[in-house]
């Protein structure tokens, strides 16, 4: 009998040890078949990947992250691991669209530059609508962030679908509609000629009114809220010329109804100059960051992006909505009437770190730097794992700091340091540890039953 008890206790101890040793399975990147999210007339080469954290906020916000040329959804998930980690703690959903069939995004065809016209922009918007419906997302908190071709697509999404997107961050992008210059609707996107064409070379110039009219023509009759935007560009960029920064300023200040003269200029960190423009209610709605001597390799800073979107904390309103309640629609995926600007308090500016960066919670508003940490140097941990040190949105050179050395069209993104420690459960089954525990306990019960039937 004593031997039997010893055997049972040993089995129980072993089972307990196995339960303790079970690996924690978290959320993972999942592909969604186009038959589930798509619609007739959308490009067949566009794929959808989605990351849904284990713990979602009530009415979770959504961040779209279009990749660079030669990129894909899986790669962008790794490159933006610091933002994914924040999604785990703040409970927002991330969509990683993929256009590997074309290598780069179509931000120049008449299909993509036409509200409801289909194309790549229409495909991404369809992904957003699917996610809003399936997960009960917040239609007033949909954002986009991307670098190079992903930055170009971000600006196209904001210009063509202002009723869907609240804000965006464009790294090394170009003005909405610029990519249409010389675009061949027959051959489509991905053509190397586009990268050496007039827009890529910074040779497309228009007045602010011309740029604004172009954007407004993509959604005729729309009078609602226009998304806010951050644009980052290196002064030594030879892939997508820095000259596009001046055109971007002319375009978006006109679209947003602002003067081309900035509300202010500062230096949030050494070598980076920020110009910012405030709306009538005092909230910063457009920012242009120039990085001295930087080429096509602007660093991705997940914590700063999250702060700009107001996603560095769980729940709540978009920061612009909170600062200017009368100027921003309450949140409908069809846009709403918009409302006049100028309502709300003095606001506060949403800078991206460094000295100042207002939170803009409506009221007197003081500046409160949105992001700490320099370019690509922040490590953030969340339930999905620890993000590696930041890399750079890079092109052909690569090298240190997690940068990806892939070349191709000269439009690839340096990694988010995925080799330096992202422990996110990418592509693994998120199996329930409770089910595994039940299996072990059942096995233990079977062994105990057999022991009882043995003669003593």
Swiss-Prot record:
<keyword id="KW-0812">Transmembrane</keyword>
<feature type="active site" description="Nucleophile">
    <location>
        <position position="419"/>
    </location>
</feature>
<feature type="signal peptide">
    <location>
        <begin position="1"/>
        <end position="26"/>
    </location>
</feature>
<keyword id="KW-1133">Transmembrane helix</keyword>
<dbReference type="GO" id="GO:0005886">
    <property type="term" value="C:plasma membrane"/>
</dbReference>
<comment type="function">
    <text>Esterase with broad substrate specificity, that may be involved in degradation of plant biomass present in the habitat of S.cellulosum. In vitro, displays acetyl esterase activity, aryl esterase activity, paraben esterase activity, carboxyl esterase activity, poly-3-hydroxybutyric acid (PHB) depolymerase activity, and a low feruloyl esterase activity. Does not possess any paraoxonase activity. Is able to bind to multiple substrate molecules simultaneously.</text>
</comment>
<dbReference type="InterPro" id="IPR050955">
    <property type="entry name" value="Plant_Biomass_Hydrol_Est"/>
</dbReference>
<keyword id="KW-0732">Signal</keyword>
<protein>
    <recommendedName>
        <fullName>Multifunctional esterase</fullName>
        <ecNumber>3.1.1.-</ecNumber>
    </recommendedName>
</protein>
<feature type="compositionally biased region" description="Gly residues">
    <location>
        <begin position="382"/>
        <end position="391"/>
    </location>
</feature>
<dbReference type="InterPro" id="IPR010126">
    <property type="entry name" value="Esterase_phb"/>
</dbReference>
<feature type="active site" description="Nucleophile">
    <location>
        <position position="148"/>
    </location>
</feature>
<keyword id="KW-1003">Cell membrane</keyword>
<dbReference type="GO" id="GO:0005576">
    <property type="term" value="C:extracellular region"/>
</dbReference>
<keyword id="KW-0378">Hydrolase</keyword>
<feature type="transmembrane region" description="Helical">
    <location>
        <begin position="433"/>
        <end position="449"/>
    </location>
</feature>
<dbReference type="InterPro" id="IPR024038">
    <property type="entry name" value="MYXO-CTERM"/>
</dbReference>
<feature type="active site" description="Nucleophile">
    <location>
        <position position="149"/>
    </location>
</feature>
<keyword id="KW-0719">Serine esterase</keyword>
<dbReference type="GO" id="GO:0052689">
    <property type="term" value="F:carboxylic ester hydrolase activity"/>
</dbReference>
<dbReference type="Pfam" id="PF10503">
    <property type="entry name" value="Esterase_PHB"/>
</dbReference>
<feature type="active site" description="Nucleophile">
    <location>
        <position position="412"/>
    </location>
</feature>
<feature type="region of interest" description="Disordered">
    <location>
        <begin position="382"/>
        <end position="426"/>
    </location>
</feature>
<dbReference type="InterPro" id="IPR029058">
    <property type="entry name" value="AB_hydrolase_fold"/>
</dbReference>
<feature type="active site" description="Nucleophile">
    <location>
        <position position="386"/>
    </location>
</feature>
<comment type="similarity">
    <text>Belongs to the carbohydrate esterase 1 (CE1) family.</text>
</comment>
<keyword id="KW-0472">Membrane</keyword>
<feature type="compositionally biased region" description="Low complexity">
    <location>
        <begin position="392"/>
        <end position="410"/>
    </location>
</feature>
